[in-house]
Structures are given as structure tokens and as C-alpha cells.
Amino acid sequence: HQKAKQAIDNGYFKKGILPIEINETYINEKNKRANRTYTIDTDEGVRADTTIEALAKLKPAFAVKGSVTAGNSSQTSDGSSFVMVMSEKLMNSLGLKPIGRLVNCASAGVHPRIMGIGPIAAVPKVLKQAGMTQDQIDLFELNEAFASQSLAVIRTLNLDINKVNINGGAIALGH
């Protein structure tokens, strides 16, 4: 949440968010129908006021002595996104500027009982296919269904934490 809040405050997401105007009908405090209009232009799930102390007080979600809580799990979010993947030739013909480059891709499976650790198998595979090392990667965007799963990936792959989800991940921004 802290990384996502900082990214929002610094305007990092502004160019990537299309503001949506909402016209809402609701029942007000006088139990009467009312209307209001507002604009959504910022991710709503980020809890800027979350503290380590507050998170430590949350009860486990799945097992009595478990580590997964509502505070270290991603919320379900309402949003959408898209990306355009195209050849350099098409990009140039359309006069577009790239924001990234797809160097290679790979898929890898892990045992289904261990959810969320696919990158442990996929990252070394794709790096080998591309003839690259982790040091050549500037940023790792890992899904964060649960913090424990993300930490397992980061620790097993020995990733530089300063290169992982630098603007927040799914725990703050949504799954």
C-alpha cells in the first residue's frame, strides 16, 4: 500500500487512467432518493493509512495459525486495462512510441497445490531463452494474490526487492 500510495501521490498512474464520470442514484440519510455525480480517476483500493501495527492485529483468513490475512491479500477490484502488442513496423507506421519491449515469453507449471509460485519456474526459463540474467532486468511485476506467495517467489529467485512491484502490487491495486 505504501508503494502504491507513493506512486499515486507522484502521479505515476495519471497517464494510464482514463477518468470515468459516475452518475449515481442512491438513498440519502433522509431515506429519499438522491443523485450525485463524481469522477473516479484514482485506484480506490489503496489503503494509505494502513500501518504495520494494524496489519499485525488481523486474524488469519484460512487457517487458525495461518499467516494469510485480509491485510496481506489482494482485494477484488473493479477496473480494466489493455495493452497493445504490435510489431515495430506497425508501431512506426502508426506513429506510436513504445513504453516497453517484449523480449521473450515463457510459461511454466508448478504443482497445483502450491498456488502463485509459477514465476519460480517461469523466470529462469524465460531468462535462459532470452540469453539474459536477472541483473539485466530493470523491473519485475509479480502478481500478489497473497504476500506469502510473493515473498516465496522473491526469496527463491533472490530478486532485488527494489526491482519488484515498485509502484505497488495487487495487494494494494487489486487482483
Please name every model-derived segment.
Residues 1-3, 85-89, 116-130, 148-151:
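Short, well-ordered amphipathic alpha-helical segments that serve as non-catalytic structural scaffolds
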Residues 1-93, 156-163:
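N-terminal extracellular/periplasmic Venus flytrap/periplasmic-binding protein-like
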Residues 3-6, 108, 146:
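A short structural micro-motif
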Residues 17-22, 96-107, 135-144, 163-169:
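Beta-strand segments within the central parallel beta-sheet cores of soluble alpha/beta enzyme folds
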Residues 31-32, 112-119, 144-162:
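Short glycine/threonine-rich loop-to-helix capping motif typified by GTGT followed
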Residues 44, 66-81, 103-129, 138, ...:
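Active-site pocket-shaping loop/turn-to-helix segments
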Residues 91-95, 124-139, 154-161:
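Phosphate/pyrophosphate-binding loops at sites that engage ATP/ADP/AMP, CoA/4′-phosphopantetheine
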Residues 91-101, 117-119:
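A glycine-rich, aromatic-flanked flexible loop/lid motif
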